[in-house]
Amino acid sequence: MSSSRIPQCENSSRLSLSSIFRYFGTTSTIATMSPKKVTIIGSGNWGSAIARIVGSTTKSFPDEFDPTVRMWVFEEIVNGEKLSEVINNRHENIKYLPGKVLPNNVVAVTDLVESCEGSNVLVFVVPHQFVKGICEKLVGKIPADTQAISLIKGISFDKTNQGVSTEKRGGLKLISEEIKEILKIEVSVLMGANLAPEVANDNFCEATIGCKRKAEDGPLLKKLFHTDNFRINVVEDAHTVELCGALKNVVACAAGFTDGLGYGDNTKAAVIRLGLMETTKFVEHYYPGSNLQTFFESCGIADLITTCYGGRNRKVCEAFVKTGKSMAEVEKELLNGQSAQGPLTAEEVYLMMHKTGLDAKFPLFTAVHKICAGEMKPAELVDCLRNHPEHM
């Protein structure tokens, strides 16, 4: 290479660092940051489906991500074998996602702290009632610049009214807020019309990432999840994205009740519409300033429709009506050790609405809780819909 093409110092004998940066570019040829290490916290049906995606994308972007993806697994014995060993040896979650191969760079780790050690990105995908306990075990164990993203569809009810300005919200705390409050790190969210079995089958679908620091964190998170069949859109309205993901499970319970009662698609359509109306009002009341456009993302109307026709909450609530069994019995029979988040979210939503005197303004949400709690008969739901304030 001729001297005219190489930046040199005045004495032409050695290169200055600034000259090298000007020649090569500070962000391209010379790498200033090591690849990000990713940990998936959770290994259920949804967590394992997401692991298939993340395991693939991390290998596709070796400059951005470390190729090894650690997945925290709550150890179980399945057919006489440790689940973690089955995942690591046969690359299959035989309990929660049987028949689907996990990428060989996804490594099951049973120790929570060990699974997160040195990680730069934490993907939370566990039932929402376990988040607080998990985060408390990680306090002081992760760097302050760690990014987190929650795929958890639920909310936290703060009975003490302590923490993130929850008093004016009747104790409402988003899962992302709970993670951020405990771990002191930035938290984004991913929600959408994403039934786990279909995602695992690589069926085309969309998802929404809610990222308050869209310019700083959005591009990396999109690379982590975006594929040909899992299309990601990033928005800044993270609170709305997250609440849509939580509240749609409550509406899906109502849809399941109407299915169990033998009503048709017209009635279910009414449930979906009224549920959407209550969702938009709930978001605007507790988190003023939401963007209406967010409800038209995958996290909004699309997820609501999908869950009311195909989700586990609908399925469980239909069986609850038809069999007369308790919710716990139905979950045990139908969900293979997992739980429906709708009934618990409905209870938490009701408690915070009741505390702020708003339960009468959200009759569908209120009815779902009371039916799940045995305080109202499922057949009374239609009367609730018939007398909804939207019809007055």
Curated annotation (Swiss-Prot):
EC code: 1.1.1.8
Residues that, per the record, bind NAD(+): 42-47, 130, 153, 196, 312, 341
Catalytic residues of the enzyme: 248 (proton acceptor)
Pfam families with a match to the protein in the record: NAD_Gly3P_dh_C (PF07479), NAD_Gly3P_dh_N (PF01210)
Cellular compartments per GO CC: cytosol
Subcellular localization: Cytoplasm
Keywords annotated in UniProt: Cytoplasm, NAD, Oxidoreductase
Reaction(s) catalysed by this chain's protein: sn-glycerol 3-phosphate + NAD(+) = dihydroxyacetone phosphate + NADH + H(+)
Chief subcellular location: cytoplasm
Binding partners and assembly: Homodimer.
NCBIfam families xrefs: glycerol3P_DH
Protein name per Swiss-Prot or TrEMBL: Probable glycerol-3-phosphate dehydrogenase 2
